């Protein structure tokens, strides 16, 4: 009897398909003879392109349809860019595997300027991320930030059409789509702290599906998983979402995790920063502890204001 194929739910954007095929290839390499199929679908996040994400439900718009497909048995797993995965999961589903992290940095893309510092006053910069906007406005309050939605190709086309002087994108996505040549410079974490989980690919499935969980086990990258769990524990404690500028980046130094994080106002007028070091065995607790420190240092008031504005 032929084993049932594994079905991967995925969005249809080039980057989503790259990620799904990456997991498909990894599964087939780890389990020769395994059949793996892609189940493509369109999410609300792909359709609603004329409104800022924070106003229409946040990044969860990109995963809800995939989760319904798994809960209804039409798919066995879903592949996500970890920076787009909400802090909470529906009953019966969970994040079971985190693959090795790609470059977590933001990338500066422009046809005219080599780096942020070269932009003239009043230059128009495109991003859909409040996190990037916050840090950019703090460093360069003289810049004009303009909403930028759509997949990577669409965003580059808008830049090329002259709608923006520069745009900020995730370096990982450009590298995966073999568009690294478009990157004029990388923005280091000291200048723009990445999003929670940025650059990592995560796999969600039904938590009681032991067959799928066993098949996925070889794809888990322990170092990346500890770093991302640390970042996500911080984000969960802050109840972070698309409506608030939150950045975090965890690094491993031997068996020690170094976590940096920030919470800020979208206009960059106030940013609360913090960092913590501790054993990787306590990755999640470190994230929780740093979040509590940020909350006590002014992040609580920022978050309350921002969430009130979106109610």
UniProtKB/Swiss-Prot annotation:
<comment type="pathway">
    <text>Porphyrin-containing compound metabolism; protoporphyrin-IX biosynthesis; coproporphyrinogen-III from 5-aminolevulinate: step 2/4.</text>
</comment>
<comment type="similarity">
    <text>Belongs to the HMBS family.</text>
</comment>
<dbReference type="InterPro" id="IPR036803">
    <property type="entry name" value="Porphobilinogen_deaminase_C_sf"/>
</dbReference>
<feature type="modified residue" description="S-(dipyrrolylmethanemethyl)cysteine">
    <location>
        <position position="242"/>
    </location>
</feature>
<keyword id="KW-0808">Transferase</keyword>
<dbReference type="Pfam" id="PF01379">
    <property type="entry name" value="Porphobil_deam"/>
</dbReference>
<keyword id="KW-0627">Porphyrin biosynthesis</keyword>
<dbReference type="InterPro" id="IPR000860">
    <property type="entry name" value="HemC"/>
</dbReference>
<protein>
    <recommendedName>
        <fullName>Porphobilinogen deaminase</fullName>
        <ecNumber>2.5.1.61</ecNumber>
    </recommendedName>
</protein>
<comment type="function">
    <text>Tetrapolymerization of the monopyrrole PBG into the hydroxymethylbilane pre-uroporphyrinogen in several discrete steps.</text>
</comment>
<dbReference type="InterPro" id="IPR022418">
    <property type="entry name" value="Porphobilinogen_deaminase_C"/>
</dbReference>
<dbReference type="Pfam" id="PF03900">
    <property type="entry name" value="Porphobil_deamC"/>
</dbReference>
<dbReference type="GO" id="GO:0006783">
    <property type="term" value="P:heme biosynthetic process"/>
</dbReference>
<dbReference type="GO" id="GO:0005737">
    <property type="term" value="C:cytoplasm"/>
</dbReference>
<dbReference type="InterPro" id="IPR022419">
    <property type="entry name" value="Porphobilin_deaminase_cofac_BS"/>
</dbReference>
<dbReference type="GO" id="GO:0004418">
    <property type="term" value="F:hydroxymethylbilane synthase activity"/>
</dbReference>
<dbReference type="GO" id="GO:0006782">
    <property type="term" value="P:protoporphyrinogen IX biosynthetic process"/>
</dbReference>
<dbReference type="InterPro" id="IPR022417">
    <property type="entry name" value="Porphobilin_deaminase_N"/>
</dbReference>
<comment type="subunit">
    <text>Monomer.</text>
</comment>
């Amino acid at each position: 009897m032929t084993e049932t194929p594994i079905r991967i739910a995925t969005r249809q954007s080039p980057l989503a398909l790259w990620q799904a095929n990456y997991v498909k290839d990894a599964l087939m390499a780890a389990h020769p003879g395994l059949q793996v199929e892609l189940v493509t679908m369109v999410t609300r996040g792909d359709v609603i392109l004329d409104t800022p994400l924070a106003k229409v439900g946040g990044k969860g718009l990109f995963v809800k349809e995939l989760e319904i497909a798994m809960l209804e048995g039409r798919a066995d797993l879903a592949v996500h860019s970890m920076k787009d995965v909400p802090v909470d999961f529906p009953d019966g589903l969970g994040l079971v595997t985190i693959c090795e992290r790609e470059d977590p940095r933001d990338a500066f893309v422009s046809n005219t300027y080599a780096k942020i510092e070269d932009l003239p006053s009043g230059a128009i910069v495109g991003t859909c991320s409040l996190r990037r906007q916050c840090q950019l406005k703090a460093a360069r309050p003289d810049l004009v930030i303009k909403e930028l939605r759509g997949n990577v190709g669409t965003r580059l086309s808008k830049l090329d059409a002259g709608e923006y002087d520069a745009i900020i994108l995730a370096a990982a996505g450009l590298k995966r789509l073999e568009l690294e040549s478009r990157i004029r410079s990388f923005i280091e974490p000291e200048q723009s702290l990445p999003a929670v989980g940025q650059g990592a690919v995560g796999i969600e499935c039904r938590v009681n599906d032991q067959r799928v969980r066993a098949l996925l086990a070889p794809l888990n990258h322990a170092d990346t998983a500890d770093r991302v769990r640390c970042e996500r524990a911080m984000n969960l404690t802050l109840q972070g979402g698309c409506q608030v500028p939150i950045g975090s980046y965890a690094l491993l130094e031997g068996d020690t995790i170094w976590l940096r994080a920030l919470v800020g106002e979208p206009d960059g007028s106030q940013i609360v920063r913090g960092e913590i070091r501790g054993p990787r065995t306590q990755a999640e607790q470190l994230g929780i502890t740093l979040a509590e420190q940020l909350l006590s240092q002014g992040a609580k008031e920022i978050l309350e204001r921002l969430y009130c504005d979106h109610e």
